[in-house]
Structures are given as structure tokens and as C-alpha cells.
């Protein structure tokens, strides 16, 4: 299996305003993607939910600056794999299935490990769908 990813046309600069729907799942994905950008990503009117707050806290725990204001949120990314966290950092995903399934893939190339925890409901879910492929990548 080839484990290399080749990006032919790398985006050098992207400055646009995107109107996102007030969707919890999209907001979590935005937070994770913004953590990988270089510089400031800003989202206005993020929905207020426990799952989104768990995602923002997770991004903070991996060493990315998050500034939450009344009507917007900024994430100041460090670029691809620009994580600054200690080995065995504990991240609480709360009840967010989206976060708990996407974050491990995002952090798979990190030299440090995380301990991903969640509430009772999340802890009962089957994660073999993500564990098996991640193990194949090493």
C-alpha cells in the first residue's frame, strides 16, 4: 500500500469569506481544518453547542490558539501537523461522534499520543471503523 500523498497544486494564499450554515458537524470540521491552516481563520455565528465547545477545547489542547468572542471565533493555525502538545495529552470529546472520529486521523502523523475520552454514551460506541485503518497506516 502506498502511504504517500502528493498534492500537485498547493494553495499558496486563500482569503475569502465563506458563509457556512449554522451546522454543528460543519462547525467541528471547520475547527479541525482551521487548526491546519497557517494564520487566522474566523467563523461568525458558530452554533453554541457542547460538541462544538469540545472541538474548540480539543484544538486548544493540541496547541492551537483559539479566541472565542461574542459573535465569532478565531483559530490561529500553525500549519500542517503544527501541533504543540505533550505525549499522552488527554482530550475530552464529550458526546461528539464527529470529533472523536475525525481527530485521531488528524493527529495520526504526530509523534505524540493522545488519550481520547468521552462521556458514557460516546464510550459505548464502536470505533473499530477508524481504529483498523489508522493501524494500517502505522
State where each predicted segment sits:
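Structural preference for solvent-exposed beta-strand-turn elements
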Residues: 1-138
Amino acid at each position: 500500500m502506498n502511504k504517500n500523498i502528493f498534492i500537485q497544486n498547493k494553495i499558496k494564499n486563500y482569503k475569502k469569506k465563506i458563509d457556512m450554515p449554522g451546522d454543528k458537524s460543519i462547525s467541528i470540521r471547520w475547527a479541525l481544518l482551521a487548526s491546519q491552516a497557517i494564520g487566522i481563520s474566523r467563523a461568525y455565528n458558530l452554533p453554541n453547542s457542547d460538541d462544538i465547545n469540545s472541538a474548540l477545547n480539543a484544538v486548544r489542547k493540541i496547541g492551537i490558539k483559539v479566541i472565542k468572542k461574542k459573535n465569532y471565533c478565531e483559530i490561529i493555525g500553525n500549519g500542517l501537523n503544527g501541533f504543540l502538545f505533550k505525549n499522552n495529552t488527554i482530550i475530552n470529546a464529550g458526546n461528539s461522534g464527529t470529533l472523536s472520529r475525525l481527530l485521531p486521523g488528524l493527529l495520526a502523523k504526530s509523534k505524540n499520543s493522545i488519550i481520547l475520552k468521552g462521556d458514557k454514551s460516546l464510550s459505548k460506541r464502536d470505533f473499530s471503523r477508524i481504529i483498523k485503518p489508522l493501524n494500517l497506516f502505522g
